[in-house]
Amino acid sequence: GRFAGFPSAGYAVLAIEIHGLEPSRENIGAVHWTEPDSSILFFREVQDGVLNDIHELGKENPYHYIHRRSLLAVMRAMDYLHARKDIDKDRIALFGGSQGGGLSLIAAAIDKRARAVIATVPGFCDQTAWLYGRCGGADRLKGGDREQIIEAMSYYDAALAAQLIDVPVYIGVGFIDATCHPTKVYAAFNNLAGPRTIENFINIAHGSPPGWRERSIEWLDKQFMMGR
């Protein structure tokens, strides 16, 4: 699974699915099923229906944007962890990739209970890059008011939020990533206010190389001074 290795390393994992779907069904459209059951058909229908163009929903208003709900979900997850007696509140980290990586950065800027962040090929970085001659972001303008979208997306830009993050951050960036472009990820990394480390995935697109999870755990151990 996505978090294999963390429990055996001594970390409790709370995985949230921000859209209310099972994590195992995230990429249901990319899976070929010979005999899809009713559950699989449901998730496929949702992906092609209500969750189609999910990142565009409400994009003209920061209070109506779909990922306001996502960030609230992260903060409610933090509330839950802080309500448990078996969790060390001083060693809570946010971990995510792509959409989850960008949201982890934004959430850490808002919720100071996060003590470290690991973001793999994070999204939501440098949302208006195209305004300054950098790649990415221009497609966000399709089907909406230009100025309203630019203003609303500034509330959900991980590169802008990064300047509010003063806890340690570990970022992985794919150098041939056409989804979360490396220039955008570096815009976030360069704005981080606290200790920061970045690993360049030279020949990797939108993903991570073998051993990335193990290195992430090692990095987290160092931040939290976890002895093995």
Q: Model-found features: residue ranges?
A:
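C-terminal catalytic histidine-bearing segment of alpha/beta-hydrolase fold enzymes
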Residues: 186-228
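Acidic catalytic loop of the alpha/beta-hydrolase fold
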Residues: 175-180, 206-207
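Cap/lid segment of the alpha/beta-hydrolase catalytic domain
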Residues: 3-7, 12-72, 129-136
